[in-house]
């Protein structure tokens, strides 16, 4: 049973946020953090967390359907707009093991964020604080003290990713 935010983060990953209500019968608008429609369409049992109220809600998903860039979700125990209003702003969490398995060269953002990044020489570049999606490839935002370094997630720039050790080895690039 999840009692603290630390329990939640140890067992589950946030996949999106409830941004608004939809209609009068308890449906909610869901903004996904993932571009995998499969994850959202297969939701069954989720934990919602409201950071302002420090409240957890264990809910069962009844239905999911797409609406433009959002999804509409109906939960079994939420059947009025008033009940839906109470979960507005909550992040939606699923168990890590419910995420689809990835090939070795793929990753989830949560696996890369907070990784320590080193150049091949051993120099510590910093920690991954953000990932920018550019369309062609992702770019790591690595911060050490107040200095930020951008490192493209390409085979030319990344030598090794050790997700278990939270460590990335990158080539030191000389920019022209």
UniProtKB/Swiss-Prot annotation:
A Pfam family reported for this protein in Swiss-Prot or TrEMBL: RimM
Domain comment as written in the entry: The PRC barrel domain binds ribosomal protein uS19.
GO cellular component: cytoplasm; ribosome
Subunit structure: Binds ribosomal protein uS19.
Domain of life the protein comes from: Bacteria
Protein purpose: An accessory protein needed during the final step in the assembly of 30S ribosomal subunit, possibly for assembly of the head region. Essential for efficient processing of 16S rRNA. May be needed both before and after RbfA during the maturation of 16S rRNA. It has affinity for free ribosomal 30S subunits but not for 70S ribosomes.
Principal cellular location given in the protein's record: cytoplasm
Family: Belongs to the RimM family.
Bilayer-spanning residue ranges: none
Keywords recorded for this protein, A-Z: Chaperone, Cytoplasm, Ribosome biogenesis, rRNA processing
Any GO MF annotation of the entry: ribosome binding
PRC barrel domain residues: 104-176
GO biological process terms, semicolon-separated: ribosomal small subunit biogenesis; rRNA processing
Annotated localization: Cytoplasm
Protein name, per record: Ribosome maturation factor RimM
